[in-house]
Amino acid sequence: MKILALDSSGLVASVAVVEVDTLLGEYTINYMKTHSQTLLPMLDEVAKMIELDLNTVDVIAVSAGPGSFTGLRIGSATAKGLALALHKKIVSVPTVDALAYNLWNSPSLVCPLMDARRQQTYTGLYKFTDGTMDTVLPQCVVGIQEIIEKINEMGEAVTFLGDGVPVFREYIEENLKVPFSFAPAHCNKQRGASVAVLGAILYAQGKAEDAADHKPEYLRMSQAERERKEKERDFRI
């Protein structure tokens, strides 16, 4: 099976193609350009380099959230457009799960941290047992203090990764009471390859969907939505 994977959920944009257990190509960039400028050119470049006929792709996997609202919309719109044009299914891969999968078979707890602003983080907790990733805490949006308290209660060593690490590193170092480490550069941000491999697992579980049914998983309202609700509430008062 051949999977095309897209991830534009955070600062990183990544495109990958995986066939069975082989990574045919991956293009990842973390630079000062919007994903609307980079994602399709990256896909085009990968397709050229590996001589990919998009019609041979079996399914499209996309990092479906949480994350940057704009980034998620770009990734989902790109995946939907491709799926509709190619008559393929989409597999929605939870962003935090895919991040955790970067550290496959880690002996410690894995805790992805994505900066959700306002001292909050998109996060979760994961363990690997005999090559299988088990979810200890499903992806969620919480205050950084809440996830650190949870880890302290569990009393297990943990490895952190994600764009939230630089934001919360000082807090972690001051408040965490268990052994901890930070993932190195080659595996500490979103990767299309992880989205593809986890997407293959979800596809085998029958979790593919029609393009028309796909939508991002934001986990919370946008700033504009919150402000609108506040105005509506004030108006009712």
Stretch-by-stretch model annotation:
Residues 30-38, 69, 73, 77, ...:
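Residues at secondary-structure transition points
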Residues 62-90, 95:
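DPxDG-like acidic metal-binding loop motif
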Residues 181-237:
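Acyltransferase
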